[in-house]
Amino acid sequence: MIAVYPGSFDPITLGHLDIIERGCNLFGSVIVAVARNPNKAPLFSVQQRIQQIQTCTQHLANLELDTFDTLTVTYTQKRQAQVLLRGLRALSDFEYELQMAHTNHSLSPHIETVFLATSNEYSFLSSSLVKEIAKFGGSVAHLVPENVAIELEECFTKTPPSVSIPPPTAPSTPTD
């Protein structure tokens, strides 16, 4: 059985990697499909994201990497996959993902969505959070694969965030 795990993976986190590894244990083949979204300005190019994922998933023999720029369900049909694999971190994820699963099912009834609950240690983790921490010089080594942590550090040491700090004001003196 073929499963597609779609996402932007900008960048891949240990939470994503957890879902990928567990998916590879459940399905005969897992395709990690990196989305090309023209409406978003990603930190890393699609090629960089593919390379990041490839580097940290070399140990998974039944994994394939690909890109797509269509509806997820259309891509899944094209790849003749039977399953859309999704990770759930919190109840808020479930509400959105359930809506998407129903929509995808209405478009392609033979494709099932399988939800995997994220492992507890990654339940708070998102790519946006990782980028925010890295942007302000915090360590993300415990949140992303080692190769990604290095790339994030390189990215943000080249272009540190601009923070505008107002100049100090002179203390006011009381007038009589």
Swiss-Prot record:
SUPFAM superfamilies: Nucleotidylyl transferase (SSF52374). ATP binds at S8, F9, H16, G87, L88, R89, E97, Y122, S123, F124, L125, S126, S127, S128. Substrate binds at S8, K40, T72, R86. Disulfide bonds: none annotated. Keywords: ATP-binding, Coenzyme A biosynthesis, Cytoplasm, Magnesium, Nucleotide-binding, Nucleotidyltransferase, Transferase. Its cofactor is Mg(2+). The record marks H16 as: Transition state stabilizer. Belongs to the bacterial CoaD family. This is Phosphopantetheine adenylyltransferase. It comes from Acaryochloris marina (strain MBIC 11017). The lineage of its organism: Bacteria, Bacillati, Cyanobacteriota, Cyanophyceae, Acaryochloridales. The gene is coaD.
